[in-house]
A protein has these predicted regions:
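Beta-strand-rich N-terminal accessory domains
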Residues: 1-58, 63-66, 208-230, 278-288
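Extended, loop-rich substrate-binding clefts of extracytoplasmic carbohydrate-active enzymes
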Residues: 2, 62-115
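Hydrophobic residues positioned within well-ordered beta-strands of beta-sheet architectures
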Residues: 8, 87-89, 107-109, 120, ...
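Short solvent-exposed loop/turn micro-motifs enriched in small/polar/acidic residues
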Residues: 48-50, 70-75, 102-106, 149, ...
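A short, structured loop/turn motif at beta-sheet edges
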Residues: 80-87, 112-117, 146-150, 239-242, ...
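Acidic, contiguous internal or C-terminal segments within carbohydrate-active enzymes
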Residues: 93-147
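Active-site/ligand-binding surface loops and adjacent short beta/alpha elements
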Residues: 141-144, 148-228
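Active-site pocket scaffolds in enzymes
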Residues: 222-288
Length: 288
């Protein structure tokens, strides 16, 4: 898809955004999936964001195995509409999926270009007679503008904020403790990017603290941002020495340490009643 400002490519595998090109500046903004650092571009996280505790989930009293970030990112979607500025992809539940996630669902993902903005809309339809539960999230990785640049050439900006609080993954338990919070004190809404920032994996922000985040050049010039109104959780992540940063709005997130209750009792879980549809959208904004 393309317009006068942006050119994008989306794969049917995972309905994953694989290219985001700024035609005005000649810049590829999306990570190229070089496996040395990370083999993905912008996976869709469904039906679970992150890991469930001990890699299992309890649904109606039965334990099911789970994989990190769910199966949608490795599933084949069907492109049901391909236009010049908007495309829609569909993933429908199968019997194989029900072995790990025993719900009927239809997941629609629509990408729409509007000038310098890429809108990404999720719809989860429930065609069954029972309530379904899930979390869903975005994971776009934004590469730095020049090959020789690193994290210290950029800063993060959070408009309207002067302080944020986040929790980290306990690397022994592979789950976060939401009671163990860290403060991020901002300087004029900004915070420096460093390699050390991601030593404990992702930074996890809860309580709808972040609804807009930007990667900016060190002089404060905006580079690329993500707007995500009403998303309760947010992840910021990178890999050591990798020339990219992920800005990740999440509708729900990984399990906390020790969570072993029914999926319906999980904090931040989304539910869709029989015949109803869940809808949510975020936007990637490119500076031109």
């Amino acid at each position: 898809m393309e317009n006068d400002v942006l050119s994008v490519e989306i794969a049917e595998h995972g309905a994953e955004l694989t290219k985001l090109y700024n035609k005005k500046t000649g810049t590829d903004l999306l990570w190229d999936a070089e496996p040395k650092f990370w083999k993905r571009h912008s996976p869709v996280l469904f039906p679970n964001v992150g890991k469930t505790y001990k890699n299992t989930v309890k649904i109606n009293g039965t334990q099911y195995p789970t994989s990190q970030h769910g199966f949608a990112r490795d599933s084949e979607f069907k492109c049901i509409h391909a236009g010049k500025e908007t495309s829609t992809f569909l993933l429908t539940s199968t019997e194989e999926m029900k072995e790990v996630y025993p719900f009927d669902f239809e997941l629609f993902i629509t990408y729409t270009l509007e000038k310098n903005v890429l809108h990404v809309k999720w719809e989860v339809k429930n065609p069954s007679d029972e309530t379904i539960y899930f979390t869903i999230g975005a994971h776009p990785a934004f590469r730095f503008a020049k090959n020789e640049e690193g994290k210290t050439d950029y800063i993060l900006k959070f408009p309207g904020k002067d302080e944020l609080k986040y929790c980290l993954i306990n690397l022994k338990e592979m789950a976060p403790d939401p009671e163990e919070l860290h403060e991020m004190k901002l300087n004029e809404e900004t915070y420096p990017l460093t390699e050390e920032l991601f030593e404990n994996d992702a930074l996890i922000f809860d309580n709808t603290q972040i609804e807009e985040a930007w990667i900016c050049h060190k002089d404060g010039t905006p580079y690329v941002g993500v707007k995500s109104e009403g998303f309760p959780s947010y992840g910021i992540w990178s890999v050591k020495d990798a020339p990219f940063v992920c800005l990740e709005p999440w509708m729900g997130r990984c399990d906390n340490i020790g969570f072993d209750k029914e999926i319906s009792e999980k904090p931040g879980i989304n539910k869709v009643e029989s015949g109803e549809t869940f809808e949510k959208e975020y936007q990637i904004v490119v500076t031109i």
